[in-house]
């Protein structure tokens, strides 16, 4: 439809879809109020939407949330952010799903590692997984049947070093 009023909103580098949705809801309420007031005063002119710039998103299925570690760290990080909170990005480990709630981009990599390999899995250092172009740190995760938790805490009593996430 036609556009009456627009506002821009920056997306933060580590912001999840859920966090962005909350900020958009607050902004949307303000913009709606402003739009109705300005429309009532006759201050707005409808501008036709450019159909070439309009985009559509298909239905997001659970399988869309599966992480492919042969992709770049940035692509994986953005997938995790975009799938949080629902349906939640995941990978498989030992035939079981592992929900990955948050990640952090790393500046260094491990060229000898294979994609999906848990290169560092230490309760003090964290969980670092090999990607197509380096490493990504998993900072918050959830094993099947367990609660969502900080990755370092989740690694207590678990030895994932050398394991593969698929």
Language-model region placement:
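Active-site-proximal loop/hinge segments within enzyme catalytic domains
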Residues: 1-106
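An anion-binding loop in the catalytic cleft
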Residues: 64, 69-166
């Amino acid at each position: 439809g036609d556009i009456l009023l627009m506002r821009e909103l920056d997306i933060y580098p580590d912001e999840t879809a859920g966090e962005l949705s909350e900020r958009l809801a607050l902004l949307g309420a303000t913009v709606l109020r402003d739009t109705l007031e300005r429309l009532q005063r006759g201050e707005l002119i409808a501008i036709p939407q450019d159909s070439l710039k309009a985009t559509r998103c298909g239905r997001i299925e659970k399988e869309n949330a599966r992480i492919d570690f042969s992709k770049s760290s940035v692509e994986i990080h953005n997938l995790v952010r975009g799938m949080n909170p629902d349906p939640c990005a995941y990978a498989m480990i030992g035939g079981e799903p592992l929900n990955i709630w948050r990640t952090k981009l790393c500046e260094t990599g491990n060229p000898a590692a294979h994609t999906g390999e848990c290169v560092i899995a230490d309760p003090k250092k964290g969980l670092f997984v090999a990607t197509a172009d380096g490493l990504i740190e998993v900072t918050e995760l959830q094993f099947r049947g367990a609660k969502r938790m900080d990755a370092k805490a989740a690694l207590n009593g678990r030895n994932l070093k050398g394991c593969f996430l698929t």
